[in-house]
Amino acid sequence: MRKTRIIASAGLAGAALMGACTNFLNSDKAVQNPNNPTTATTAQLFVGVQANIFGEQEGPVAMIICEWMQQCAGVNGRFVDQQGVYSISAGSFDGSFQSIYTGGGLLQIKQVEKQADAAGDKVTKGMAEVLEAMNMMFGADIWGDLPYSEAAGTNTTPKFDPQMTVYGNLLTLLTNAIADLKGAGGPNPADDLIYGGSTTKWIEAAHTLRARIYLHRVEKLGNGEYTNALAEAQLGISKPADDFKSAHNGATSERNMWAQFQTSSFGNDLVAGSILVDLMTAQGDPRLPDYFGLNPKKTYGGYNVTTQATAVADISPILGSGRTDDDAFSQPIITYDENQLILAEASFKLTGAAAAAPFLNTVRAEYGKAAIATPTLADIMNEKYIALFQNIETWNDYKRTCLPVMHPARSKAVIPGRLFYGQTEEQTNPNTPSSDQQNLFTVRNANDPAACPP
């Protein structure tokens, strides 16, 4: 209410004045605090959603998977028990589970899609749909059954959808995303932190994601899923420059999460794992200095999780590597190398070694490694294990193929195949199985019915 209007109204009866002021104080502009906005623009939401995806892929879940897949090793603090006896609880990854839904998760993704739809912006909607598929795939891969179909509505206790149903829905979602990405509109290129507005790159990434989902269903549905994975990967990421990566800079709150952790007081708690280091050393792989720092002997070595008896002088830190020395390092999330190795695995399973060799050797040639004329499945999966360092997908590959060969931590019969649901979900949603119904060593997700042999 303008000051001149107040002065002009001074002679009005008190009741009328009170009514006018009441209406003013209840108006939208009065109750909205400009420092605490009640709505966000599509662009603001879209940037937040991308940041949340980066956090999911680089955060605590990625670190424990790096341990359990023995690319990394925990030698101090909580990491010793997380790796040595697989000691985790429902509280260990509560924030990670909640990130699927809030803070840039499903609720905000759905809002981006809704606002983009209302604006006739099919391209932004398609990008959000790809991110929705990534987000929910992250959840389904790790926890199996989870809330999805009812999770973004008004139901505060949504049902848990079966994992295989979620995968099927995500395949449909990605088909819709690809169609929308061929439509009109699009974000400001600066707001697309991943591809700068390139719909071609988003479409290729969507096809690689579809190939991933088909791979994740192989163990349950059979080798026919390899045919589908092959077809999708043939349309997937077509060159290394088009990798789907996180975006970071040197600002304290915007650094790569691995770099943040390694430069913290806990950085030395997580070091190199022997399986990965030994594999790379045997192949003369030039990425060793990008992945790990030198050990006290000025060489590269990893901690052996099975024996738990590696000398300190033989262990390489992760700190001091090319990745952790760069606060702005863009973490590879979906890559050309992965896509080529999906083609290699699917071709091997469907046709044989000769069909797989060109795809495997394309990746090996990138790093100056000799071609393998007649590769085995182990050759393919070992190469992918190297390529996907610090990537959650390594766990999915291992659960499907049991490669590379690795043994559980000492005194344990199997490597776990899932995590506990978040504690908050367990406490607030009665549909959540309790922790005592989620034995890490006997309960498997639907797509992974059998544990790998010890």
In which residue ranges do the predicted regions lie?
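Bacterial N-terminal signal peptides that target proteins for export
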Residues: 1-10
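Bacterial Sec-dependent N-terminal signal peptides
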Residues: 4, 15-45, 49, 133, ...
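Membrane-proximal, proline-rich intrinsically disordered regions
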Residues: 21-76, 236, 406-454
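Structured, solvent-exposed acidic/aromatic patches
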Residues: 39-43, 74-342, 346-359, 373-377, ...
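Bilobed periplasmic-binding protein-like "clamshell/Venus-flytrap" ligand-binding domains
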Residues: 60, 386-400
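Alpha-helical protein-protein interaction modules
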Residues: 365-368
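Cyclophilin-type peptidyl-prolyl cis-trans isomerase
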Residues: 376-390
